[in-house]
UniProtKB/Swiss-Prot annotation:
Substrate binds at residues 33-36, 224. GO terms for molecular function: ATP binding; galactokinase activity; magnesium ion binding. It is found in: Cytoplasm. InterPro entries: Galactokinase, Galactokinase_bac, Galactokinase_CS, GalKase_N, GHMP_kinase_C_dom, GHMP_kinase_C_sf, GHMP_kinase_N_dom, GHMP_knse_ATP-bd_CS. It comes from the Bacteria. This is Galactokinase. The record marks 27 as: Transition state stabilizer. It comes from Lacticaseibacillus paracasei (strain ATCC 334 / BCRC 17002 / CCUG 31169 / CIP 107868 / KCTC 3260 / NRRL B-441) (Lactobacillus paracasei). The keyword ATP-binding applies. Catalyzes the transfer of the gamma-phosphate of ATP to D-galactose to form alpha-D-galactose-1-phosphate (Gal-1-P). GO terms for biological process: galactose metabolic process. Pathway: Carbohydrate metabolism; galactose metabolism.
């Protein structure tokens, strides 16, 4: 898929030529899962799969929207006068949410837009298709209406849409990775301070393989919000005995010394993941900088174990992929990526072994689960941008 596909689709739907094309990537997180809302570090990167848009003006004061990913929905009109109406339960809620947040922040929409969207991110697979759409919309509206918003402002607008409009208490990682991505680099982001640095992802003879369970997951309907609430409860208990603003501020030793303050064993497990995952992320980013891929892979796998047993956000589909991935020749590490409860996992695989890896893991998954997983070799890409 490329920009030519969406310009052709635009003409078919709207009967005229598109004037602009845009792209926003998806993302994977190398390590640092469920730490972004706990004041910890994350280590994501944008990928070459993503969401494209072809855009043209119209004479109506309305956004006229079509997605090739949801063809049965057809063209949806959102008049400017309806921006602050309730959401409709459609993909267009993400467009409407971004538009209303930007309008509130001072954006001036001077004319209507026809927008044709098509993406090659599997919907609900944990590669941040919703955040990709949000950052795509933010880039379109910021560029075409001279909004003047900085990239980090667009990131925060996207988070606000998720939290206040869609109803998902997500952190900042997805929107940040998609808006700020750079080719062949991952971003070590401290979500507590929003300080970040780009680090080259040099895998030598290895590649990152994305493994899609093809079990669709819904953030708002999953236990994502429950996990965040559990971490907040654990933090509140710790704060009765020690001075700490977020779980991400604690070292492993500090946490172990103060677990007596958390009298619920489930909450201890949830908080332990947040604290130890943050430290794993720092160690992993250093290992990657040092070229120590063996240590990096071990930390990635340790993250997966913690997500399965302390945070309990995997399930049989993800566990089957990761367990079988780690049995294969040429694999340095593997774990689920994203929020969990279905979606995708990643594995670091020697490029010479990728074909056998996909065959073997795919066969084991099909035998255990009863349907196919899908596999993609990830290219680390630039962030959201205008293409023409």
């Amino acid at each position: 898929m490329n920009s030519t596909d969406v310009t052709k689709g635009f003409t078919e739907q709207f009967g005229k030529q598109a004037e602009h094309t845009f792209f926003a990537p998806g993302r994977i997180n190398l390590i640092g899962e469920h730490t972004d809302y706990n004041g910890g570090h994350v280590f994501p990167c944008a990928i070459s799969l993503g969401t494209y848009a072809a855009v043209g003006t119209n004479e109506d004061n309305a956004f006229r929207l079509y997605s090739a990913n949801f063809p049965k929905v057809g063209i949806i009109d959102i008049p400017f006068s309806d921006l602050f109406q309730d959401k409709r339960g459609l993909w267009t809620d993400y467009f409407q949410g971004m538009a209303r947040v930007m309008k509130t922040a001072g954006a001036n929409f001077t004319h209507g837009l026809n927008v044709y969207i098509n993406g090659n991110l599997p919907d609900g697979a944990g590669l941040s298709s919703s955040a990709s759409l949000e950052m795509l919309v933010g880039t379109i509206l910021n560029n075409l209406f001279d909004g003047g918003f900085e990239p980090l402002e667009l990131v925060q607008f996207g988070v606000k849409v998720e939290n206040d409009y869609i109803g998902v208490n997500s952190g900042v990682m997805d929107q940040f990775a998609i808006e700020m991505g750079r080719a062949n680099q991952a971003t070590l982001l401290d979500t507590n301070t929003m300080k970040y640095e780009y680090l080259p992802v040099e895998m030598g003879d290895n590649v990152i393989v994305i493994m899609n369970t093809n079990k669709r997951r819904e953030l708002a309907d999953s236990k994502y919000n429950e996990r965040r609430s559990e971490c907040e409860k654990a933090l509140a208990m710790l704060q009765k005995g020690i001075e700490v603003k977020s779980l991400g501020q604690l070292s492993e030793d500090e946490f172990d010394e103060n677990t007596y303050l958390i009298y619920d064993p489930i909450l201890i497990k949830r908080a332990r993941h947040a604290v130890f995952e943050n430290q794993r992320t720092l160690k992993a980013s250093k290992a990657l900088q040092d070229g120590d891929l063996k240590t990096f892979g071990k930390l990635v796998s340790a993250s997966g174990v913690s997500l399965a047993f302390d945070y309990e956000v995997t399930g049989i589909e993800l566990d089957t992929l990761v367990t079988n991935a780690l049995k294969q020749r040429g694999v340095l590490g593997a774990r689920m990526t994203g929020a969990g409860f279905g979606g995708c996992a990643i594995a670091i695989v020697n490029s010479a072994d990728v074909e056998d890896f996909i065959d073997n893991v795919g066969k084991a998954y099909r035998e255990k689960i009863g349907y196919d997983a899908h596999f993609y070799v990830a290219d680390i890409a630039d962030g959201a941008r205008q293409l023409n």
